Amino acid sequence: MVQVNQTKQFLRFKFIKRGSLQYISHLDLVRTMHKVIVRAKLPLWYTEGFNPKPKMIFAAPLSIGTESECEFMDLRMNEYIDPSEAMARINANMTSEMQITEAYYPESKFTDLKWMSYRLSFTPVEINDDLVNLCNEMLSLDTVEVLKKNSEQTMNIRPLIKSALATRVGDSIVVDAVLSADPSAFLNPEYIVKYLKDKCGLLSHPDLTAEHYEIMRLNAYFGDMTEFR
């Protein structure tokens, strides 16, 4: 049984963010969650001062345009509340595109989160086995170089990729990848998209509406690849 610190107790919520909500910014997510948890009438701990706010901490914020089955938020409570009761109160104020799936008092910290799994789905104009094989060849290289964001410098993201495998699924190429989620070395899955576009020609059709891709975050892990919670 988890021993809850009565003086500083955080309740952890795992939640999904799908559909149109993939396009809201992290700041908008924080604002939305703030409204929801206030409506849920949870026994929240508030900061002191002229503008008291509840203590909310999020793990590995997503980029705009990424769906997720695995988001985490820690809320500091002023007193104990049963996790299932807290989850029910919050979900009553949520849409189907964002729902709490688990609530519990954690024994881990967000700094213990080391890996996250993703599914990247590409729908090119033309698909064949050679293109799938090329994706796997490029992803298996010892050096996987991409341009840094807003920079002309390159970086090798190979150490931040635990695994990445491309397969053909119907008219799509699906890449299942486990990427670093370490707060000091977080790898945005958009870098995998950028790399495959540059090296394999994915998403390079002159008609920008002809091809598309989707990213779904699936799960989170400790350093030993046991499920994070």
Residues covered by each model-derived region:
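Short Lys/Arg-rich amphipathic alpha-helical segments
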Residues: 20-22, 30, 34-48
